[in-house]
Amino acid sequence: MSGYIRTLFIRNRFSNYRLRSQIIKYKYSNVSYLNKSALRCGQATDSTHPHILQPGELTPRISAQEYKTRRDRVASLLEDNDFMIVTSAPVRHMCGAAFYEYHQDPNFYYLTGCLEPNAVLLMFKNGASGSYDCSLYLPSKNPYIEKWEGLRTGSTLGKKLFQIENVYDSSLASSVINALGKKSNRIFYNYQTGYLSKMPAASAPEFIQDTLTKLFRTSTQRSVDELLHPLRSIKSTAELECMKEAANISSNVYREIMRKRFEKEAEMSAEFNYRFCIGGCDRSAYVPVVAGGKNGLTIHYTINNDIFRPDEMVLVDAGGEFGGYVTDISRTWPINGKFSTVQRDLYQAVLNVQKKCIKYCCTSNGWSLADIHFESVKLMHEELKQVGIHGTKREITDILYPHSIGHEIGLEIHDCSTNNGYQPLRKNQVITIEPGLYVPEEDGWPQWAQGIAIRIEDSVIVGDDKPFVLTSAAPKEIEEIEALKK
């Protein structure tokens, strides 16, 4: 401090009074900042946001101890001298300076509970002792940047918040990666999907990109997914509580929206996004599908810019996210509140398939998700024959019902995507069951059915002897749906 004052005095030739004023201003503004930073981190805490977090929670429903247990579990899967590098998600921009809402990388979040960008988790399995080293690298405290971008946790507060002993400034990460990379046998890294998978370092924080690029030129990397997806697949009690919360909120939103009348897809889409948030979710888990009439023939229809026509149905695929965990629901209902005879028959056919498939979601059957899908195709074939739609099983899977019966959900809407769908289901996996029917406007299919699209989807916890449907409060029985608009 004395050097700073001496330089300031010589350079600016302050009077004693002005120099004293500058010292006081500098001193107390800095102390004020430090006091505030000691109370507030780069994410919500149980002391600053008690309306979000209960005492002891690092993220909603989940404690720092549970995150440590997860790190211990993945460390037990590492071999001697294995090195794991898990980076936070990058900030993504729409264009120029306009950025998207930040969403953390699911693997990084699963292991740390940290919600900040530009962070790195390193884990190294010691060959001699069998123990593992774990270190977290966070952006340093910086009053100027925090004024623009929000608070940072920093290394000092990070040790206490995340209960990781070794938390350092992110500027130190490159040297550690370089040193550990040289003596590692296998390197695990969290590759991003899409084109970034061909440039693995491109999605990493800028301060380690050069280091990773050099390291990856001389080593072979494996995806952390092969270690983490099997662990993430089986949900803990706390994780299931998050998913129940997301499902309950989302199911109630469906019920309320089904009561109302809308003229435009955009209005209904906005209502879903709004109600998820005011109901207690963090955000929509994904861009809602709100498809009126034949728009539902596009399975991932998200443009949501058409008008509703009274004699048509609307297919909605939307769900909320709570504490990082998502729910996935699809419902189809008539715009005017009353199913026509054709709509009723086709809807009931799909519903029958869905309800039968849900019953298979238990470990006692020994079935895999693939087994349930193959059974759903058989059931769909039988149901459609009864209502007058005749097609081969190949035509059903290629045209009328071209997607799978379901997928895992959790921190991602298609969670643990590297898991083998042919493995028997395990207790506390959470999956979707979502048969669909999409009759194209083409010759060869009954005129009376053309343009009709139906999907019915629930989020389901796999049990030992019977499943638990998380989203059962979202109406799907015909009588219940019709009663909502009376």
Curated annotation (Swiss-Prot):
> CDD domains given for it?
Prolidase
Q: Which GO terms describe its cellular component?
A: mitochondrial inner membrane; mitochondrion
* Needed cofactors: Mn(2+)
Q: Which UniProt keywords apply?
A: Aminopeptidase, Hydrolase, Manganese, Membrane, Metal-binding, Metalloprotease, Mitochondrion, Mitochondrion inner membrane, Protease, Transit peptide
A GO MF annotation of the entry reads: manganese ion binding
Its EC number is 3.4.11.26
Q: How does it sit in the membrane?
A: Peripheral membrane protein
Per its UniProt record, what InterPro entries does this chain match? Aminopep_P_N, Creatin/AminoP/Spt16_N, Creatinase/aminopeptidase-like, Pept_M24, Peptidase_M24B_aminopep-P_CS, X-Pro_dipept-like
Protein's name according to its UniProt entry: Intermediate cleaving peptidase 55
**Species assigned in the record:** Schizosaccharomyces pombe (strain 972 / ATCC 24843) (Fission yeast)
Phylogenetic classification of the source organism: Eukaryota, Fungi, Dikarya, Ascomycota, Taphrinomycotina
